[in-house]
C-alpha cells in the first residue's frame, strides 16, 4: 500500500463544500454507506502500479475491473458510441488486449 499516493488522492478529491470526497471518474460525491453504489473505494489507475490510486464510486470501480485508466476510458467511449448508434458495429479496437487479469510481477 502506498500511503503517500493515498493521502495525495484524498487531498485532491476532497470537496469541502460537499463535505465529501468526489469520484475521480464522475465527480459525484461519495458516501461511506456500505453496499451503496456511490460508496467510496480505492481504485488503481493501472492495476500493476500501486502508486497511482484514486477514490472512485464502488459501481465505477467494479466497471473498471482490471483495466488501466486508458483502457477503461476507451471502452466506455466505445460503449457510449455504440449505444448512441446501435446500427454501427462496435469499435473492437477499444477492446483491451491480453488476459483478463494482469500477470503478477516476478519477485524482485
List the predicted regions and their residue ranges:
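Short, charged surface segments at domain edges that flank catalytic/cofactor-binding sites
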Residues: 1-22
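Histidine-centered nuclease catalytic patch
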Residues: 22-58, 64
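Polybasic, low-complexity binding patches
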Residues: 46-54, 62-104
Amino acid at each position: 500500500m502506498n500511503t503517500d499516493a493515498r493521502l495525495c488522492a484524498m487531498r485532491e478529491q476532497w470537496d469541502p463544500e460537499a463535505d465529501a470526497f468526489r469520484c475521480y471518474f464522475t465527480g459525484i460525491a461519495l458516501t461511506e454507506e456500505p453496499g451503496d453504489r456511490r460508496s467510496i473505494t480505492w481504485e488503481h489507475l493501472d492495476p500493476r502500479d500501486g502508486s497511482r490510486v484514486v477514490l472512485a464510486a464502488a459501481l465505477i470501480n467494479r466497471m473498471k475491473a482490471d483495466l488501466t485508466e486508458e483502457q477503461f476510458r476507451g471502452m466506455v467511449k466505445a460503449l457510449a458510441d455504440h449505444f448512441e448508434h446501435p446500427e454501427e458495429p462496435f469499435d473492437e479496437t477499444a477492446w483491451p488486449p491480453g488476459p483478463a487479469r494482469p500477470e503478477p510481477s516476478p519477485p524482485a
